[in-house]
């Protein structure tokens, strides 16, 4: 079975085409600037890159171009579209209804529309991508894989906010959590690497990129996560503030004469390590500036490392212990310095980092803790696309 995995943004589209027989990525690519001038498709096969610049007025045009690239006589990997067994779609928000991935039908589409109010930036392009694929491949099964689904096992006492309860019942205001597909993948992978049943493990997974979240996984289930009703809650991120005193918001609105859109923009796009450092939202730039003596850049990193460290400690308390910690995503996988700083002062939990292991190599799964470290620490590259493909494969196989 060969599965196309689609991840639609507002003006972009990422894809992978995976042969599930051996889980090989046959092709992958990125479409940028959809609906704008200079729209471009970068298509990769066996590390060979092909760039196609062609006008794409919408996501349907973009997906048609992706299908053309996959079936191209020179650069393609299949002869025709009948070789695409099914399509797996990343969907950011499934609300409370979906705790698992699901075959897309009319009822599912209706539910996705209802979730737009919970994810106004993310769900609309996800829906547009699904509709475009359905128009181009009407007889191909489609599966929705939700970022929020993995966190539906979080207990009620952990997901309820201390607000009037009727706000939860009427508006669905509660913790949902995000990056669920990534947290699910690396928690399963670390259990495999440790040679243990995931049901016997207490795992803390740290998805650290421009967007970042921490997850507590107990017996294979998410029991707590740092992102909340939106991806704004939690640790300081690239441009997002993370959790702050809510009373700051009306104070800022009054003092700076901000409206709600201004405030939303400030919290989501001008805060985080970018807001503190004044340098960049890219951690590589901030690390470089800190090394050159920029005090605000160093402060931004100190704040970030402290926030992550604090969540690791609190999640160990939430689970009554921890067996392993996993670092993943851009920063988690590539910054040995950040991993080392985060793990400082966590010796009381039984975490001991091996400097040599932490600094050697990247791009593969590895243990970075000392052999006698009570809590094992891993770096594991995430693979959300493979997780989406696996879910899609399982659901579609059961249809037959």
Curated annotation (Swiss-Prot):
Entry binding sites for ATP: 14, 207-211, 282-284, 330-334
Binding of Mg(2+), residues: 7, 384
Record-level GO cellular component terms: cytoplasm
Protein's UniProt keywords contain NADP: no
GO biological process: acetate metabolic process; acetyl-CoA biosynthetic process
Compartment list: Cytoplasm
CDD domains given in the database record: ASKHA_NBD_AcK_PK (cd24010)
A Pfam short name: Acetate_kinase
Reaction(s) the record says it catalyses: acetate + ATP = acetyl phosphate + ADP
Residues the UniProt record annotates as site (Transition state stabilizer): 179, 240
Active site: 147
Chain positions recorded as substrate binding sites: 90
The entry's keywords: ATP-binding, Cytoplasm, Kinase, Magnesium, Metal-binding, Nucleotide-binding, Transferase
The organism's place on the tree of life at top rank: Bacteria
InterPro entries per the UniProt record, alphabetical: Ac/propionate_kinase, Aliphatic_acid_kin_short-chain, Aliphatic_acid_kinase_CS, ATPase_NBD
SUPFAM superfamilies: Actin-like ATPase domain (SSF53067)
Single GO MF annotation: ATP binding
PROSITE patterns named among the record's database cross-references: ACETATE_KINASE_1, ACETATE_KINASE_2
EC number from the UniProt entry: 2.7.2.1
Pathway the protein contributes to: Metabolic intermediate biosynthesis; acetyl-CoA biosynthesis; acetyl-CoA from acetate: step 1/2
Cofactor note (record): Mg(2+). Can also accept Mn(2+).
Protein function: Catalyzes the formation of acetyl phosphate from acetate and ATP. Can also catalyze the reverse reaction.
Assembly description: Homodimer.
Stored PANTHER family: ACETATE KINASE (PTHR21060), ACETATE KINASE-RELATED (PTHR21060:SF15)
Sequence similarity: Belongs to the acetokinase family.
Protein name according to UniProt: Acetate kinase
Taxonomic lineage from the root: Bacteria, Bacillati, Bacillota, Clostridia, Eubacteriales
Gene name of the encoded protein: ackA
């Amino acid at each position: 079975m060969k599965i196309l995995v689609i991840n639609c943004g507002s003006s972009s589209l990422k894809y992978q085409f995976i042969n599930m027989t051996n889980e090989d990525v046959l092709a992958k690519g990125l479409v940028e600037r959809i609906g704008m001038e200079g729209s471009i498709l970068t298509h990769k096969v066996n590390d060979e890159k092909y760039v196609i610049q062609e006008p794409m007025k919408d996501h349907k045009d973009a997906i048609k171009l992706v299908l053309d690239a996959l079936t191209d006589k020179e650069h393609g990997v299949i002869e025709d579209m009948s070789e695409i067994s099914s399509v797996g779609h990343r969907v950011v928000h499934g609300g409370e209804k979906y705790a698992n991935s699901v075959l897309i039908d009319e009822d599912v589409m209706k539910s996705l529309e209802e979730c737009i109010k919970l994810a106004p930036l993310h769900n609309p392009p996800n829906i547009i991508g699904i509709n475009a694929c359905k128009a181009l491949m009407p007889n191909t099964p489609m599966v929705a894989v939700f970022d929020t689904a993995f966190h539906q096992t979080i207990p009620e006492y952990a997901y309820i906010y201390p607000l009037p309860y009727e706000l939860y019942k009427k508006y669905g205001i509660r913790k949902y959590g995000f990056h669920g597909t990534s947290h699910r993948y690396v928690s399963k992978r670390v259990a495999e690497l440790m040679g243990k049943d995931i049901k016997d493990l207490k795992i803390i997974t740290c998805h650290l990129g421009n967007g970042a979240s921490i997850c507590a996984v107990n017996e294979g289930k998410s029991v707590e996560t740092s992102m909340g009703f939106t991806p704004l809650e939690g640790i300081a991120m690239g441009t997002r503030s993370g959790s702050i005193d809510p009373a700051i918001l009306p104070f800022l609105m009054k003092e700076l004469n901000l409206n709600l859109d201004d405030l939303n923009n400030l919290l989501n796009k001008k805060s985080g390590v970018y807001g503190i450092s004044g340098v960049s939202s890219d951690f590589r730039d901030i690390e470089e500036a800190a090394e050159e003596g920029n005090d605000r850049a160093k402060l931004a990193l100190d704040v970030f490392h402290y926030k992550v460290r604090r969540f690791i400690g609190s999640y160990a308390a939430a689970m009554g212990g921890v067996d392993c910690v996993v670092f993943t995503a851009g920063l988690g996988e590539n910054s040995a310095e950040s991993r080392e700083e985060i793990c400082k002062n966590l010796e009381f939990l039984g975490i001991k980092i091996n400097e040599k292991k932490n600094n050697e190599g990247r791009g593969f799964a590895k243990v970075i803790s000392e052999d006698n470290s009570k809590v094992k620490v891993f770096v594991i590259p995430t693979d959300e696309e493979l997780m989406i493909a696996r879910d899609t494969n399982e659901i579609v196989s059961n249809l037959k």
